[in-house]
Amino acid sequence: MNEEHRMERPGMQETRKIQKTGGSTYVVSLPKKWIQTSGLKKGDQVALSVTGDGTLTVDPHIPRASERLVKVIEVTHATDSKTLLRQLVGSYVTGWDVIEIRGKGRITPELRRTIQDFSRRVIGPEVVEESSNLVVLQDVADHADLDMRKVVRRMHLMSKNMLEESVRAVMDLDRGMAEGVISRDDEVDRLHWFVEKQHAMIRRNISFAAKMKTTWLESDSMLLASKAIERIADHATRIARSVGMLGDSRVDGDTMKALEQLGGEASSIMDRSVEALFKRDSTLANDCIERTAVLREKADAFLDETMKRRGRVAVGLAFVIESIERTGGYSSDIAEIAINLAEGQ
């Protein structure tokens, strides 16, 4: 095959022989088609990075420390807060370093409040410049210090506590505890967005993966696990909201004991699935998947018994049982991610 027609599709692979010139210099030729596609010429420099799995990558664009990726969002008096917030979140999670909000005229007080609220809700972006028609947000986070592995672990602990406390709030009809669970859901979302942002930054610049001492495979796995944990937090919040549906209705002791056991099993499976993820332990992950199947059977039987009741108590308990079952499902998803990561290393 002519060299000019090789390496035309992403993912294609070819082998090259290592040549030695002089006493200690090794040389590998680069595919001509790739050189042309990348817009390179003789004398240009490329960036070489060693990833966490030992792979050497060649980047045709050398990232500069001072070079920042800038996203510009244009707003008018017709722009509403919800639209702007969606644009800000989208720009954040896709890895932009700087977000400039430019107004065609003065930026309204309502939109400024939206920008400020967004800045408080996410990790990194802070207002560094502001005028009547411009607000500039810049990412000031130390990504090497707070990498996605640490964030996922933090999300796990928060979501686990939320799950356990939400079940306890239902058992005790404790509205204060339930409100505490609900108030923490935004923090889990905040952490998940940060994982999304770091994943996007790694995809944009492979040298960032080397800086974070990770690989694309691990980054993909952490993102998927983060999403599953975020959904577990959502279901813990849903369980907490069920306290209001139960009102002051007391539930019999046997039902509460069964609910406590079901919630405890779901929490345990979640713990072990995250442990399997970080240990890359396929055996442990498979055990979590099997335990989830048993949990589903118990939850379905419990739900059938619950639906024999009448009124708001039955509806409230049904919401709780379904959410506990869904939590087990998301934990099983994490276990599958752990297996994929373990087998892919």
Regions found by a protein language model. Give the residues of each.
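Cytosolic, long alpha-helical scaffolding segments
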Residues: 4-18, 23-25, 29-345
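Iron-sulfur (Fe-S) cluster-binding modules
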Residues: 1
